[in-house]
Amino acid sequence: MAGKKGSSPNVYAYFKVDGDKVSRIKKVCSRCGKGTYMSEHKDRNTCGKCGLTEFKQ
């Protein structure tokens, strides 16, 4: 069994639950499609799978 006892899963970093509604927090990669999320940096969003980089304005 991996991880520390009592640690929360990373899935909570990707979704937000408001009552009965679930919404995505992180941006989905436009090249890879659903299921691939982009990491957030200070000045850009980057996909770890395909390497797509979108710079923030």
UniProtKB/Swiss-Prot annotation:
The residues that hold Zn(2+) are C29, C32, C47, C50
Which SUPFAM superfamilies does this UniProt record tie to the protein? Zn-binding ribosomal proteins
Asked if the Swiss-Prot or TrEMBL record annotates the protein with the keyword Zinc, the reply is yes
**What's one GO BP annotation on this UniProt entry?**
translation
Any one GO CC term of this protein is: ribosome
Q: Which keywords belong to this entry?
A: Metal-binding, Ribonucleoprotein, Ribosomal protein, Zinc, Zinc-finger
> Quick check: keyword Iron in the entry?
no
InterPro entries linked to this entry: Ribosomal_eS31, Ribosomal_eS31_arc, Ribosomal_zn-bd
**The protein's assembly and partners:** Part of the 30S ribosomal subunit.
The name on file for this protein is Small ribosomal subunit protein eS31
Q: Which gene encodes it?
A: rps27ae
